Amino acid sequence: MEEFKGYLELDRSQQQDFLYSLSFQESIYTLAHDHGLNRLILNADSDKKYSLLIVKCLITQMYQQNLLIFSANEPKQNLFFGHNTDLYCRILFEAFTVILEIPFSLRERPFIERKEMVQFLNLRSIHSIFPFLEDKFSHSNYVVDILLPHSIHLEILVQTLRYWVKDASSLHLLRFFLHQYHNWNSFIIPKQSRFFFXKKKKBQRLFFFLYNSKVCEYESIFIFLRNQSVHLRSISSEAFLERIYFYEKMEYFLEVYAKDFQAFFWLFKDLFMHYVRYQGKCILVSKGTSFLMSKWKYYLVNLWQSCFYMWSQPGRVQINQFSNYSLDFLGYLSSVRRNPSMTWSQMLENSFLISLVIKKFDTRVPTIPLIRSLSKAKFSNILGYPISKASWADFSDSNIIDRFGRIYRNLSHYHSGSPKKTSLYKVKYILRLSCVRTLARKHKSKVRSFLKRFGSGLLEEFFMEEEQVLTLNLQKISFTLRRFYGRQIWYLDIFCINDLAKSE
């Protein structure tokens, strides 16, 4: 938040078109460069250096009747005043994202102060969700595994912002730019379609922001209906609804949906349900019956298609009994393990045997997805056989070893919450041998000759076990406390899961 304050020094006359005026401030593009374009500009050719004047001319050109249409098949013609149009589109994309995120960031702080909520930075961690899962999932019966719909027209995404952003000029500029960017056959939106969420990963920050705004709109209504159906109101849900600023929507659904769905509310009385979403996937967990979960599945699919114009196949919503199902979520295979036990109980002179079943939330590290990621990043083939990283062969020896070691430490750090680390040992073997093959490739020697020359202990300090790192950092913790917690420790400093291919 403090970073944005220096870029918001506007006159009162500019307050009406607050966001639109920011589109022509050089400081915004400097901030956009600092956030996402550093690597792009540093690796750019000499003719790709940008200037604010070219950006302003490009914005002005979009409003002209003679709009420029560029061909992706002829990249040499994709020039605007002698500069590469693709570069300026990326700059505009990043700047639009920064500008649209400003009102959301400004609104979040007053909300927290008004609710007197204590700010814990650890709550930002992805791992902060797992203690909640451990506490709630062991008492649940059914889990609904949901893949969110992803085919959304760009116009629908822009219209979603109208409930938050009251600046019509900035919305018109955003709409102009998105349609023009489609005409330029961008690397984000396929030429054959204007529907969002292609699987290419370049410059998707703005589209992720728009898509999450649309999903939050659906979630606000879903949580509202869920709160109407239970006696115990969720404080966090109410805070979430107020935070995303859907007052107009809420008033509408209070009048319409509360009447239309009154006949269905009796089905869900006293139903304890937990909702978690990450990226394009969400899960519903409940203590209810299979019949009730089927009702929720029917409701969700119809809500998406009728109210939000998001087509979803019923097969994307799967209902499973938690005792016989492993949930693939956030890089873990999670399940509820049943541990039976027997105990003797005595009442007066009679003693009898009691059978107990203890449910425990269990997490396992999946092997196949990890090997698939290593294969995608060219550390191994699809079968997990290590290969050399050809693109790193020109780096120094210490740099190569450090890169491989950092990847393994990050993976070990993230998956430290699982007591079963067999998959990590396989990953460690693949990365170590891939590192050796890369070094041997650089020195133009065979792997066996390289190991005889430098020794196998060369890589040990870079592939230190996560448990050893933890012991070095927490030497003052007593042995009893470490034994009590075992090896399952959730690190609350992990904000994202980085793709291995981006480690370069």
UniProtKB/Swiss-Prot annotation:
GO biological processes: mRNA processing; RNA splicing; tRNA processing
Annotated keywords: Chloroplast, mRNA processing, Plastid, RNA-binding, tRNA processing
Coiled-coil residue windows: none
Tree of life domain: Eukaryota
A GO cellular-component term linked to this record: chloroplast
GO molecular function terms noted in the UniProt entry: RNA binding
Cross-referenced InterPro entries: Domain_X, Maturase_MatK, Maturase_MatK_N
Cystines in this chain: none
Subcellular location: Plastid, Chloroplast
Ranges that cross the membrane: none
Main location: plastid
Function, as annotated: Usually encoded in the trnK tRNA gene intron. Probably assists in splicing its own and other chloroplast group II introns.
Family listed: Belongs to the intron maturase 2 family. MatK subfamily.
HAMAP family the record matches: MatK
Protein name: Maturase K
Encoding gene, per UniProt annotation: matK
